[in-house]
UniProtKB/Swiss-Prot annotation:
Monomer. The subunit composition of the active BoxA/BoxB protein complex is not known. GO terms for biological process: phenylacetate catabolic process. Its EC number is 1.14.13.208. PANTHER family: 1,2-PHENYLACETYL-COA EPOXIDASE, SUBUNIT C, PHENYLACETIC ACID DEGRADATION PROTEIN PAA. This is Benzoyl-CoA oxygenase component B. GO terms for cellular component: cytosol. Induction: By benzoate. Keywords: Aromatic hydrocarbons catabolism, Dioxygenase, Iron, Metal-binding, NADP, Oxidoreductase. The BoxA/BoxB complex catalyzes the aerobic reduction/oxygenation of the aromatic ring of benzoyl-CoA to form 2,3-epoxy-2,3-dihydrobenzoyl-CoA. BoxB acts as the benzoyl-CoA oxygenase, after being reduced by the reductase component BoxA. BoxAB does not act on NADH or benzoate. SUPFAM superfamilies: Ferritin-like. It is an enzyme of class 1 (oxidoreductase). It catalyses: benzoyl-CoA + NADPH + O2 + H(+) = 2,3-epoxy-2,3-dihydrobenzoyl-CoA + NADP(+) + H2O. It comes from Aromatoleum evansii (Azoarcus evansii).
Length: 473
């Protein structure tokens, strides 16, 4: 018998719920088999300095200590219940939130939970080789922290499936462990989660940009009228903040190191900087363009009847719904979207309900831009003119209005011929990727960092930068 509060830290009264115990007991061995097969490569023996969620108390929700990842205590936590909580948007606005799934929304809610749940193991699979080329112990530990928390987020979604969706939910829980990122026959649900994450530059961009999509999706589900889903996502957001920090600070340290070498050598010539073993800023810009455009597609089409239905039915709200000053029903509201008309990109107003994907994408863009602005302080501090910019939202898109046209980063509609000629200046080329790949060698001495990345300003949980974050046995 498993001691539930110890083996699976939780605040869902697992000890009392025999049906749920049985379901999770069957699922747990499959999960551990998946982790051993598809989790971080060659890492089963490492003792890693990790935080583990142990409660939802803001002051002490996490414990830090050394743990083998296979033995990590993947817990199930929902943010605390809020008194007599009411639905805040859609046609049910003002009614009590739901503690059980209404029959008419059962299949839609299940699909929403499965789609979100599928991204969690997918990113672990995408990142499983990265430990073999970690630029430092500090970074290796951060990678593993992100991985175990993606694993915990999978547990959180599987808990909802098991607790509220009966046999269908149990089958979906198994299927979440059977799909594989990039697999031809049984891929992950969303395209971006079938892309490779071949190097640490891609990993930092992914955690900065694509995990930020996760933040906005979770935040809109945290508004849901289905209270267990809302509370689950609210607590997941607490952990997601560290993932975004890993990405933003990781790229900032790459920029810092490149600027140091630019100053030493008195040049911004990419060839000379590459000869010195750092990543030139234009190459970083190309990686930014790539990850930004691929992630933008995750929001779906600009005009979406699905998004309108989810909102009207109370299943998925807007980012920070309660802070928005409107009627929260949107029957008569409009929202501005871009449109391709002949050889021009115009804007037009459409019913706000149909443009909820675009609104969430715009909220995400504002947040990404704030991070890019922080990066731009680094070259400015060194006295360099280079600034990172986000490409036009029509650039390199495969979904929505811009799927069938070519748009340059500065927002011009261009011909197939110009795209073919120019895209190598805007997106990473094979030789860019090979160069970045050539820098990826393991650097595992405490306090030492690979040549292409600067040390962080401080360590994790008040530990020094040269702390032994991972012990190899």
């Amino acid at each position: 018998m498993i001691n539930y509060s110890e083996r699976i830290p939780n605040n869902v009264n697992l000890n009392e719920n025999k049906t749920l115990q049985r379901a999770l007991e069957q699922w747990q061995p499959s999960f551990l088999n998946w982790w051993d097969d598809m989790g971080p490569e060659n890492s089963s023996n490492y003792d890693v300095y990790l935080r583990t969620a142990v409660s939802v108390d803001p002051k002490g929700w996490a414990d830090f200590g050394y743990v083998k990842m296979h033995d990590y205590r993947w817990g199930i936590f929902l943010a605390p219940q809020e008194g007599e909580k009411k639905i805040t948007f859609g046609e049910h606005k003002g009614q009590d939130v739901w503690q059980e799934v209404p029959g008419e929304y059962r299949s839609t809610l299940r699909r929403i939970i499965v789609t979100q749940g599928d991204t969690e193991p997918a990113s672990v699979e995408q990142q499983r080789h990265l430990g073999l080329t970690a630029p430092s112990l500090y970074d290796l530990r951060n990678l593993f922290q992100v991985n175990v928390e993606e694993g915990r987020h999978l547990w959180a979604m599987v808990y909802l499936l098991h607790a509220h969706f009966g046999r269908d939910g149990r089958e979906e829980g198994e299927a979440l462990l059977e799909r594989r990122s990039g697999d031809e026959d049984n891929p992950r649900i969303l395209t971006a989660f079938n892309e490779k994450t071949p190097d640490w530059l891609s990993f930092f961009m992914f955690t900065f940009i694509t995990d930020r999509d996760g933040k906005f999706q979770l935040a809109s589900l945290a508004e849901s009228a289905f209270d267990p889903l809302a509370r689950t996502c609210k607590f997941m957001l607490t952990e997601e903040a560290h993932h975004l920090f890993v990405g933003e600070s990781g790229i900032a340290r790459v920029i810092q190191r490149t600027c140091e070498v630019m100053k030493e050598l008195g040049t911004d010539d990419p060839a000379k900087l590459r000869a010195a073993g750092v990543i030139d800023l234009p190459t970083l810009q190309k990686y930014l363009n790539f990850h930004y455009s691929v992630t933008s597609d995750l929001y779906g089409a600009e005009i979406s009847s699905n998004a309108a239905t989810y909102y009207t039915n109370g299943l998925k709200g807007r980012f920070e719904e309660e802070k928005i000053g409107d009627d929260h029903k949107l029957q008569n509201s409009e929202y501005e979207v871009m449109d391709v008309a002949g050889d021009k990109i115009l804007t037009r107003h459409v019913p706000a309900l149909s443009a909820l994907n675009e609104r969430l994408r715009d909220d995400w863009i504002t947040d990404v831009q704030a991070g890019v602005d922080r990066w731009n302080r680094i070259p400015a501090k060194f006295g360099f003119d280079f600034r990172f910019t986000l490409p036009h939202k029509g650039f390199h898109r495969k979904i929505g209005m811009f799927a069938d046209v070519h748009v340059s980063p500065d927002g011009r509609l261009i011909s197939e011929a110009e795209w073919t000629h120019q895209h190598k200046n805007w997106l990473p080329t094979e030789s860019d990727r090979l160069y970045v790949h050539s820098l990826m060698g393991r650097c595992l001495e405490p306090g030492k960092f690979a040549n292409w990345i600067a040390a962080p300003a401080r360590g994790i949980n008040n530990q020094p930068v040269n702390f032994e974050y991972v012990r190899f046995n």
